[in-house]
Amino acid sequence: MALIDPFNRKIDYLRVSVTDKCNYRCGYCMPEQGAHPEGRHTEYLDYDELARIIKAFVDLGVTKVRITGGEPLVRKGLPGFIEEIQPYEGLEEIALSTNAHHLDKHAVALKKAGLSRANVSIDSLQPEKFNKITRGGNLEKVLAGVDAGLAAGLNPIKFNMVVMKGTNDDEIEAMVDYGIEKGVEVRFIETMPIGEAGISLMDQHYPMEKIMARVRAHVGTDLIPATGKSHDGPSKNFHIKGTDAKIGVISAVSQHFCESCNRVRLTARGVLALCLGQEDSVDLRTPIREGISDEALKQMIVDAMLKKPEKHFFNENVHNIEFRQMVSLGG
């Protein structure tokens, strides 16, 4: 069996949220009061349950798993969990999305456990502005985490910058320069109308064509389109000639990437979300806790792919996604 949706897209990438809790409160991701302020830890899948679902997906052809949150490093035992799933035959890569606040403490253990690489959310290089965007974040701590990750061999590390008009759009060029200095990829991301947090910031939407025009003006003819197969999915990537740096752009709103979608998302509470921008989902926690067999679980996952929608409707109707929070989906 393989995972094929109704539009003949092969699903080979699973994003797994291990928690919807986060030590930051970025405005486009999480409401100020938190996503589930009254949520119980018993609602979370435990690591054995998560591992069992991941094994089923890998047996069905998934080759890449990304660990997300919330902030995954606030959940204890993450290196051990990665070590548990790393040997699965057919799993080629385990990646992490993090705010890097705790990465300096865990980078070596994560690499030893089998983590391949990390994406770091960093929306400003100015400490006060960074603190404001994240509602309390510490830029110095994050950059120390980045350095620790690079030193541990988590390579490549990618920076994800959500560009917001009037908030941090004045730092596009500075972020490019920092990427060149560190030899990392910087990915610029449009704001997306997901959940009350994301919808509330759509007046700060900064379109991708403006971002790329400024990047091109800054680096000139040294921006070269990247070629070759990649798991980067929606990111359009460019090399900067003469450096180890790359630029990536994710234009979920102005130029959607649905025709090549190869991923689904598993939330920490056991919901299999089939589209980032629609409510289509399947509950896996209940059958797991009721003792479903491995083969029946695989068949349930195969059947779930038949419910995957063709595309999102970010440009047409934001209201169909206001009840989800980005922090629960893991991006």
From Swiss-Prot:
<dbReference type="GO" id="GO:0006777">
    <property type="term" value="P:Mo-molybdopterin cofactor biosynthetic process"/>
</dbReference>
<feature type="binding site">
    <location>
        <position position="70"/>
    </location>
    <ligand>
        <name>S-adenosyl-L-methionine</name>
    </ligand>
</feature>
<dbReference type="GO" id="GO:0061799">
    <property type="term" value="F:cyclic pyranopterin monophosphate synthase activity"/>
</dbReference>
<feature type="binding site">
    <location>
        <position position="15"/>
    </location>
    <ligand>
        <name>GTP</name>
    </ligand>
</feature>
<keyword id="KW-0547">Nucleotide-binding</keyword>
<dbReference type="GO" id="GO:0005525">
    <property type="term" value="F:GTP binding"/>
</dbReference>
<dbReference type="GO" id="GO:1904047">
    <property type="term" value="F:S-adenosyl-L-methionine binding"/>
</dbReference>
<dbReference type="InterPro" id="IPR013785">
    <property type="entry name" value="Aldolase_TIM"/>
</dbReference>
<comment type="similarity">
    <text>Belongs to the radical SAM superfamily. MoaA family.</text>
</comment>
<keyword id="KW-0456">Lyase</keyword>
<dbReference type="InterPro" id="IPR006638">
    <property type="entry name" value="Elp3/MiaA/NifB-like_rSAM"/>
</dbReference>
<keyword id="KW-0342">GTP-binding</keyword>
<feature type="binding site">
    <location>
        <begin position="263"/>
        <end position="265"/>
    </location>
    <ligand>
        <name>GTP</name>
    </ligand>
</feature>
<dbReference type="InterPro" id="IPR007197">
    <property type="entry name" value="rSAM"/>
</dbReference>
<feature type="binding site">
    <location>
        <position position="158"/>
    </location>
    <ligand>
        <name>GTP</name>
    </ligand>
</feature>
<feature type="binding site">
    <location>
        <position position="192"/>
    </location>
    <ligand>
        <name>S-adenosyl-L-methionine</name>
    </ligand>
</feature>
<feature type="binding site">
    <location>
        <position position="28"/>
    </location>
    <ligand>
        <name>S-adenosyl-L-methionine</name>
    </ligand>
</feature>
<dbReference type="GO" id="GO:0046872">
    <property type="term" value="F:metal ion binding"/>
</dbReference>
<keyword id="KW-0479">Metal-binding</keyword>
<feature type="binding site">
    <location>
        <position position="261"/>
    </location>
    <ligand>
        <name>[4Fe-4S] cluster 2</name>
    </ligand>
</feature>
<dbReference type="InterPro" id="IPR013483">
    <property type="entry name" value="MoaA"/>
</dbReference>
<feature type="binding site">
    <location>
        <position position="66"/>
    </location>
    <ligand>
        <name>GTP</name>
    </ligand>
</feature>
<comment type="function">
    <text>Catalyzes the cyclization of GTP to (8S)-3',8-cyclo-7,8-dihydroguanosine 5'-triphosphate.</text>
</comment>
<keyword id="KW-0408">Iron</keyword>
<feature type="binding site">
    <location>
        <position position="97"/>
    </location>
    <ligand>
        <name>GTP</name>
    </ligand>
</feature>
<keyword id="KW-0949">S-adenosyl-L-methionine</keyword>
<feature type="binding site">
    <location>
        <position position="258"/>
    </location>
    <ligand>
        <name>[4Fe-4S] cluster 2</name>
    </ligand>
</feature>
<feature type="binding site">
    <location>
        <position position="22"/>
    </location>
    <ligand>
        <name>[4Fe-4S] cluster 1</name>
    </ligand>
</feature>
<feature type="binding site">
    <location>
        <position position="29"/>
    </location>
    <ligand>
        <name>[4Fe-4S] cluster 1</name>
    </ligand>
</feature>
<dbReference type="Pfam" id="PF06463">
    <property type="entry name" value="Mob_synth_C"/>
</dbReference>
<dbReference type="GO" id="GO:0051539">
    <property type="term" value="F:4 iron, 4 sulfur cluster binding"/>
</dbReference>
<dbReference type="InterPro" id="IPR010505">
    <property type="entry name" value="MoaA_twitch"/>
</dbReference>
<protein>
    <recommendedName>
        <fullName>GTP 3',8-cyclase</fullName>
        <ecNumber>4.1.99.22</ecNumber>
    </recommendedName>
</protein>
<comment type="pathway">
    <text>Cofactor biosynthesis; molybdopterin biosynthesis.</text>
</comment>
<dbReference type="InterPro" id="IPR050105">
    <property type="entry name" value="MoCo_biosynth_MoaA/MoaC"/>
</dbReference>
<dbReference type="GO" id="GO:0061798">
    <property type="term" value="F:GTP 3',8'-cyclase activity"/>
</dbReference>
<feature type="binding site">
    <location>
        <position position="121"/>
    </location>
    <ligand>
        <name>S-adenosyl-L-methionine</name>
    </ligand>
</feature>
<feature type="binding site">
    <location>
        <position position="26"/>
    </location>
    <ligand>
        <name>[4Fe-4S] cluster 1</name>
    </ligand>
</feature>
<keyword id="KW-0501">Molybdenum cofactor biosynthesis</keyword>
<feature type="domain" description="Radical SAM core">
    <location>
        <begin position="6"/>
        <end position="234"/>
    </location>
</feature>
<keyword id="KW-0411">Iron-sulfur</keyword>
<dbReference type="Pfam" id="PF04055">
    <property type="entry name" value="Radical_SAM"/>
</dbReference>
